[in-house]
């Protein structure tokens, strides 16, 4: 019988409050509608469930959110591309989305396309995905090849006929069937500290707080979270900054540079652009 994580609950509460799912450019806001749902049984592991209904076939730019996703394309098909690259990748109908280090574009094949996103809490995908998570970095992997099962294929056509709560119930039942109990990890402490400090952390201090050597921290963090602590901190940091820019588009970059603790504005701009592909000044244009 499935059990709640018990001792992980405190860590999850530390990590969950900063999750940012998607930041869009202003001209993309009307290309789809979203409907948010709460998990039924897996609230300690799943941060959110979002249904996206696309109103046209325009591409949408998504910024990396720092979490693993399960994606179920319920209607239509989609292609994906890294920002500023011309090649497009066809996405499987059901897939595991690993951590992304750069923004990417998603394009539906038609108006009316739908997809469901299951977003894991930070450091919680490891309870369900049967492999080292760094193997999924910047990748989308067919769900059946990851879990070695055809369980979900039997429901593919039926998903569109079901009410959304029944779809969620079936997906959660599948996740419960592949759940693996794991001991508490010092990486939970590191992830919590990264979110608490909005990604502005020193890796050596992070290792010390986690009672690990820097090299051991990097190895375990890669395997349990999906990328290095330095890369992950950057994603959390840029999401924090993107949130500020979205809420306060009138903010002066010079003032923000020093409020955030950057050495100079050039460093700030390069840090932001390395993830989003645009400078902070152009982010809201």
Q: What does each of the following model-derived ranges do?
A:
Residues 2, 12-198, 202-204, 210-214, ...:
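Alpha-helical bundle regulatory/interaction domains
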Residues 72, 237-240, 267, 274:
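Hydrophobic side chains within alpha-helical segments
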Residues 218-223, 230-233:
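Long, low-complexity intrinsically disordered regions
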Residues 223-227, 271-281:
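A secondary-structure capping/hinge motif
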Residues 5-7:
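Positively charged N-terminal leader segments that act as targeting/secretion signals
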Residues 233-242, 282-285:
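Short, basic, alpha-helical segments at the C-terminal edge of helix-turn-helix-like DNA-binding modules
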């Amino acid at each position: 019988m499935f059990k709640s994580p018990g001792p992980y609950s405190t860590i999850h509460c530390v990590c969950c409050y900063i999750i940012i799912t998607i930041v869009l450019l202003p001209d993309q806001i009307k290309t789809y509608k979203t409907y948010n749902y709460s998990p039924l049984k897996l609230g300690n592991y799943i941060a959110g469930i979002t249904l996206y209904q696309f109103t046209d076939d325009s591409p949408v730019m998504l910024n990396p959110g720092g979490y693993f996703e399960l994606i179920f394309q319920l209607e239509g098909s989609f292609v994906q591309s890294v920002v500023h690259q011309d090649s497009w990748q066809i996405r499987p109908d059901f897939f595991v989305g690993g951590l992304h280090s750069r923004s990417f574009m998603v394009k539906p094949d038609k108006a009316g396309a739908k997809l469901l996103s299951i977003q894991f809490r930070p450091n919680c995908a490891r309870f369900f995905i049967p492999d080292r998570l760094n193997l999924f970095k910047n990748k989308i992997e067919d769900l059946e090849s990851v879990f070695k099962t055809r369980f979900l294929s039997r429901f593919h056509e039926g998903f569109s006929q079901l009410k959304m709560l029944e779809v969620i119930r079936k997906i959660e039942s599948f996740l419960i069937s592949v759940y693996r109990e794991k001991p508490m990890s010092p990486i939970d402490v590191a992830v919590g500290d990264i979110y608490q400090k909005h990604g502005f952390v020193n890796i050596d201090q992070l290792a010390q707080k986690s009672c690990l050597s820097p090299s051991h921290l990097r190895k375990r963090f890669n395997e349990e979270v999906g990328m290095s602590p330095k890369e992950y901190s950057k994603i959390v940091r840029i999401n924090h900054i993107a949130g500020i820019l979205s809420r306060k588009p009138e903010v002066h970059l010079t003032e923000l540079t020093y409020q955030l603790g950057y050495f100079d504005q050039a460093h700030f701009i390069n840090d932001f652009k390395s993830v989003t592909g645009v400078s902070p000044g152009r982010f809201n244009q």
